[in-house]
Amino acid sequence: PIPINNWDVIVVGAGAAGLMTCLELPASLKVLLLNRNTSKVSSSRWAQGGIASVIRQDDSFDLHAHDTLKAGDGLCDFQAVEMLVKEAPGCVDRLQNLGMIFDQSSDQLATTLEAAHSRRRVLHVKDRTGRALVEVLEDHIENKKNILHCRGVRVTELLIENKECRGVQVLDGANLYWIQSRAVVLATGGGGHLFTNTTNPAQSSGEGIALAWKAGAAIEDLEFVQFHPTALKFYGAPCFLISEALRGEGAILVDKNGESPVKNLEDR
């Protein structure tokens, strides 16, 4: 069992969001990072394409926002888009300061084009951007004395007292017990395995959303699930994701008859 029962913050999920959350918290806080995996598999680690950010002279925040809103078909949260676009360059700088080395072209960061972007603004580390990102963050986590990273521990319930989340119940091997904290952050990723076909790893089962809903949290926008259109499928093997950068560089989607199944979406 985990030796300490009382923490300042418990972070559930050890993908990019959970790892970065731990690093951004003050070093004065005792942080427990719970990872249901014993291996290093995660959706973040499997991410291929890259990180979109305005860094070129021929680009702008307005263009990036316009592309995003157009791709969202008018359903985007405008404030969220504005935050995403304006804070992206600073996040890229932060990652570089942490030691992430993006691909270079001449004397500047290399950029590629992905679907819906009108400018080349996707920074990458070959086709293993997610892996590079997670490895940099994990290295920093392991060197933080205020952070304990526990693998193979699964959160089964949130502890709610007076309408506040004050801890979690965990399944740790054969042991089921409660851990208290002043705050809990759920960073458990998506729910690809709610569907028959997915390129997500097995732990992408929507557990974080279920935990929050069961605890009484308001859940919204569950209908917005991204369906990635390109994967490689072999009989008896899991689906292998084919990067979105493929289409950004000019590849087109066609069925066995050479017809486009997404023709009606071309305006977006």
Residue ranges and their predicted role:
Residues 71-111:
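Rossmann-like flavin
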